[in-house]
Amino acid sequence: MDSQRSHHILTRLTKIRRRPQQPLTDFTELYSRIANETIYYLNLEEKKRYKEALQGWKALTTDVLFKQTLIEHNYPNTQSYTKDEVSLQNGIRELYHKSVMHLKRVKKLVREEPAPRNDMPSSKTYTNHSSSFTRSTEPPPVFQMVPGRMMKTLRNRNACGYKTAYSNPSLSSYGNSTSIKRGEDAENIRVNFVPSKPLSNNASRQHKNPIEHNDPPLKKETELYSDKYISEPILIDLTNDEDDHDVGILKGHNVFDEEESDGFEFDVSDYYDNFSEVDVEEEEEEKEERRRIKTLEAIQQQMSDLSVTSSTSSNKSVSSSENVPGSCIQSLPTTAPALPSLPPPPLLNVDRASSTGALKPHSLETSTTMDSSKIRNPQISKLMKNNHVPYLKGTKSTPTLITKSTPTFITRSKSNTKPIIKSNASSPTSSLTVPNSVIQKPKTAAMAAKRVLNSKKVASNPALNTTKKSHPILKSKTAKVPNSSSKKTSSHPSRPVSNSKPYSHGASQNKKPSKNQTTSMSKTNRKIPAQKKIGSPKIEDVGTEDATEHATSLNEQREEPEIDKKVLREILEDEIIDSLQGVDRQAAKQIFAEIVVHGDEVHWDDIAGLESAKYSLKEAVVYPFLRPDLFRGLREPVRGMLLFGPPGTGKTMLARAVATESHSTFFSISASSLTSKYLGESEKLVRALFAIAKKLSPSIIFVDEIDSIMGSRNNENENESSRRIKNEFLVQWSSLSSAAAGSNKSNTNNSDTNGDEDDTRVLVLAATNLPWSIDEAARRRFVRRQYIPLPEDQTRHVQFKKLLSHQKHTLTESDFDELVKITEGYSGSDITSLAKDAAMGPLRDLGDKLLETEREMIRPIGLVDFKNSLVYIKPSVSQDGLVKYEKWASQFGSSGS
């Protein structure tokens, strides 16, 4: 709020005015904390720490119930809550109910005590095969991966040449046995020290030893890659030196095509489903691995051709390693298995891509995507299909994926703690920058709460649910955006995070989203700076997104009727405006937004007396609107009707009753509705008014106090703009009626005539207290000029009874007759004011005892109260004024009282 920064004299008043926002702050903080703790406990469940999760769920449900009760106690007036506060309150309740469901489910899991599965890829082993090299018998303690522990590097610090490999780029060629051009690429690579996390259970099962990838090559000899293990390469490396290792592999092997990678899109829902795969899929994975053994031998020969021993790259590699000690050189393996890209693949550099000229026979330009359908090598494509490519993410066409298990990479970065942000640009150099337009998920649940606050805005404008880029960022899990090419439907958010349904085999290749598919990311999340995301992103963000979007979708479903009405109205307004020719769009929007009024529920019975005026209105307006087929030719209804008379006689009430009884669209016009500070805009507003009225016929254009708009043009003080408004109003008004009286055919000189009843059922209904001030041309167009006089004796009698029908009173018929006599000359509004003041008489008699007296003990209203009120309430119309009205009515009025 800008007022918080200003230091002016109203600062204290500003703080007082901010007090009602306190419930919003409390709800936001509570929602954020619930969401964060929910994600944390779901993460504990994924790690099979059910007892800790059970205790957490119990504490969370109890605390949420207490906090919510406390907030409702502190702010008991729930009716004064804003829409944002109600939305947050509903979101908190939804999260609470979900927590209760999680609590029941975890209790069941604790009772069953299922056999725990180890999620650590470093400790998960295969009996037959899982890696292309062996592990050291005593790995260094730095490689004992523990969730949440921050490690500077995954390399073996005891290995020979460790510091030299980092300090001297020329020695980087021996750091990874699988890199192609380490010597020539090391100068373009920065090492990232961000800790690596296991990708998923599937990833840990399929790729057991990538974490120890740097340790054995530095300790073992060249015979490390024996025939026993060389048949299966490492497909995913989760170490933190991907900038050195995997970029070289991508550069050398060139498995991917950057131009074809735009078609590859990543399904985040499929990506996270791997965390909760059931044991059945483990058996399927074992079968798939047995099947892959047959294909790995054929691929090994192709990968070995791209190793550091190739003739094209050996010269530079040898020259770059001249300063390496002999013991270290001997430890370099000769035929290292290739490492396909990690999820997500590291950024590629222009220099790095252009420096691999020796590898052009195997090059596919610059490669970053791992879509098996795009790979030219059929053997590698088949291998990728068997290994479930959803673990690998798209490249420059998609930004980073926020997940705890995804290692982050930094290329040409001065700080090793900043996560990488991928660019959507097509050039390779764009991968080195951090674009502002990249959409990111919220870091914490506080940002998620903002999405709840903005849920209505996002839902009311579907255009906000799309991104500016042509590439989808992440697949949405909300129910707002249907995704036909994904297995995840709108019912997905209702499922718990830890019990996600595993996807079927091959879904990654067949279920990719379209290139231009929209997402439900709000624009608020796009503005989160990348600098705020320090270190590896947390997997709790996934749960936050699930819980928040689920609560948002539920709130949006409750507001769907209201939102649908608004959206439908906007669509209809746009269609109407598009169908109108020669009408300014902005002026038409202003007419819709400010002038269109739905008819108030005022009926004939609500108006006391004025029977003659009611009959005239029925004949001139109601009957022609309801039966247009009978009113043609000479029976054509009038297009203008003027209600004039003293103030307070019920002219506006009659107009409202006409709108209700005729079931027509009601336009309430005043001088401010048709005036603009810009030259020529007022005429456009008048034109748009009549055009829309014709389109929405039957309609009534009611102009109260029309003398302010259609005053006499003979006045010397009149300016040019007001004259133009009057002229345009008169011209548009004339177009409503046919030029040839009695003709049933349209006249070419008039755009809208009786030939089309739907376009001509428009009435200009006006009311004024100064009928003699109206311009003569406007008076001519008011064919009916109805005089609304002061209420007669019978009318006043009926009005008094109507006003006192719901009040306790002691008035008899004789008292009512006396009231009618003493209120001679009072208008309808004067009588209403008199009755209100008389109703205060019993309360005035109580004085200070009013606060202690029961309602039933207050005496009823009597005639004496009305007589006392006559001292204060006087008639508002003078006798001289009445004479003037009657004179004008006899001269220009079309009907008497």
From Swiss-Prot:
Residues 120-137, 364-380, 497-523 have a biased composition (Polar residues). Residues 209-219 have a biased composition (Basic and acidic residues). Present with 300 molecules/cell in log phase SD medium. Interacts with SPT2/SIN1. This is Protein SAP1. Residues 307-321, 480-496 have a biased composition (Low complexity). PROSITE patterns: AAA. Belongs to the AAA ATPase family. Residues 112-144, 195-219, 302-398, 413-438, 456-561 are annotated as: Disordered. Residues 468-478 have a biased composition (Basic residues). GO terms for cellular component: cytoplasm. It comes from Saccharomyces cerevisiae (strain ATCC 204508 / S288c) (Baker's yeast). It comes from the Eukaryota. Gene3D superfamilies: 1.10.8.60, P-loop containing nucleotide triphosphate hydrolases.
